[in-house]
Amino acid sequence: MTPHRFPANWFLKARLKLRHLQLFVALDEHRNLHRAAASLTMSQPAASKLLGDLEESLGVTLFERHGRGVEPNWYGGLMIRHARTILSGLQEAGEELNDLLAGHSGSVSIGTVMAPAVELVVPVITTLTRDHPDLKIAVAVETSDVLAERVRQGVMDFAIGRLPDHVDASCFDYQEISSEELCFVCRDGHPLLRLGRPLTAADLVDATWILQPLGSLLRSRVEALFRAEGVPPPRKVIESASPVISLAMVAENDSVTVFARALAQVFSPTGSCTIVPFHKRFSVEPYGIFWLKDRPLSPGARTALAALRAASDTKMRRALEMPQPSSSSDIEMCMDSANNRI
């Protein structure tokens, strides 16, 4: 047989099969055609014909035959090396498929508003990365209107927030999680803290405020709270939708802002801020997990969603077991509509 140059896709013309690759490896391990054929549950004549037909098609001899068995030559050694690589890759592909089907690998993109990011998403991601180390997780913190649009576009698999009024809620599946308790925060040592008593809206109205843009849920809640106490909304307002910027500004001057209590409780022990003692507790309407109804989630996304839904169920059960406030003045809920909710 005369060697020749192998063209692109030579393996198609040679009709190279998976069985050929298995035979190369078996011959390398056994160096005997009979034993190699037996390991593949083939007859020796069938194995001999399979090898001979391929050598004829390739135009090169791969194995030297002798009385004691067979030995791969230089060409055969090359084919054995690549056969092992291909078979190993196929085995790994099967293992990865199993992991993907089980939700152990793949990727998931999660969106969330700030409060559940701290008290729900972070603990769940910690568990997911421990139990599914090959699962790639991306998390983004945004306002609810941005999250709803990104889930609708398929940029995110699911999100935790509130479905804005201008969004068609029928497109989404939604699981309510919890209402979001709010609080006012300022820097440690703020002059208002020297009053030594729970503060009212009247005490806070003249402060400099760091608030979300007009129309946002938290901004609307603060304004409604002030009006309910017969006080005009804050006038000296610096607008910022970024909790990081709000926190940095509060730490540097005598401004006041509004945070989810869960978030404030994370930052206050660090000295970044302190919770303002207010004379009543107040919150905003519940947030939940939402995802598109008609778009199937990947196995990895289903794994993450199931973990978050389980964690939210636990959170709701604990909330129901807690003692309820004695009157409506203890916790006020603002259910006013807002076009741009945070």
UniProtKB/Swiss-Prot annotation:
Q: Which PROSITE patterns match?
A: HTH_LYSR
Question: Which residues form the DNA-binding region?
Answer: 33-52
Q: Which GO terms describe its cellular component?
A: cytosol
Q: Does the keyword field hold Transcription regulation?
A: yes
Biological role: Does not seem to be required for sbpA expression.
Q: Of which family is this protein a member?
A: Belongs to the LysR transcriptional regulatory family.
Q: What is this protein's name? A: HTH-type transcriptional regulator GbpR
